[in-house]
Amino acid sequence: MRAVTLQDYKRRILHVLTYIQQHLDSSLSLDDLARLACFSPYHFHRVFRGMVGESVKEHVRRLRLERAAGELRRGSTSVIQIALDAGYESHEAFTRSFKAAFGAAPSQFRRIRRAQSATVISGVHFRPGTTLQHFRTVRGGTSMNVEIQRLQPMRVAFLRHVGPYNAVGATWDRLLTIMGKDGYLGGCPMMLGICRDDPEVTPPSKIRYDACVTVDDDFRPNGEIQVQVVEGGEYARTTHAGLYNTLGRTYAEFLGGWLPRSGRELRNAPCFEVYLNDPESTAPEDLLTDIYAPLRPISNEK
């Protein structure tokens, strides 16, 4: 079961990698790629990053730069036209990215026709006219401490933050001030965060994050603070230790390393986080955050 599951995940991601190679000049929206791979849009990007070792955006940008390197080697197309074809709006931005990738500016690269390029974990490079047969996955997640838990639905009061992920503190301050003043924090409720957009993908100004506190059935929305229900069911739980701004690495290992080897798939619902200690009184390196990923049995029919 586990070997089949891992191979299934690899096949689905390989399908996406092949599609990207063949449609490098398309918009390549994450929703479209998620549908192509039969993944929930909530989770596709983290699974992709965890298995491939780079985000979709990073992968596409690198392939376009590799294509640009080939064009510089072969022809006389102007550097600015090659830059525009690679998705850059200026010669300067293209030159910076190209030099970072190949160790030489485009004009220098064209003269010497060779330069260093970074080794990538996946082993996937721009190869026009060839069929992508396999890719190397990131080796991770096998040593993670993960528990499967069945949760009851949780009723939560929440405030929604729209904006940079690192600015959610003000939303939490507002939520806890109101809830504390109204006497709803006395029973040690759980503090949950639901990030409905991936900070590595969504523009900072559009990230939606719900700061949540568990409440009982007697709590009523009061205008500013609303109520929602976090779905019950089976969840995989792992604990992230350390700064909140390093949560992305744990997500990548969890969903791109552990999950494909677990025999499970994710439901079409967001992950959520439970904050186990107070950032106001805890050293950043000692912060503990439980990550819950919603599970469903993996289908045997593909």
Summary of predicted features, one role per range:
Residues 1-18, 37, 54-55, 61:
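Short, Lys/Arg-enriched, Trp-marked, Pro/Gly-tolerant hinge/linker segments that flank
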Residues 15-28, 48, 69-78, 98:
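Basic, amphipathic alpha-helical hairpins
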Residues 32-39, 53, 76, 87-89:
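Central "turn" residue of the DNA-binding helix-turn-helix
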Residues 34, 83-84, 95:
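The alpha-helix within a helix-turn-helix
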Residues 42-44, 48, 93-94, 98:
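Short hydrophobic/aromatic patch on the recognition helix
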Residues 47-49, 56-57:
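Conserved MFS/SLC helix-loop-helix module at the cytosolic interface between two early adjacent transmembrane helices
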Residues 54, 66, 70-74, 78-80, ...:
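A solvent-exposed interaction/effector surface
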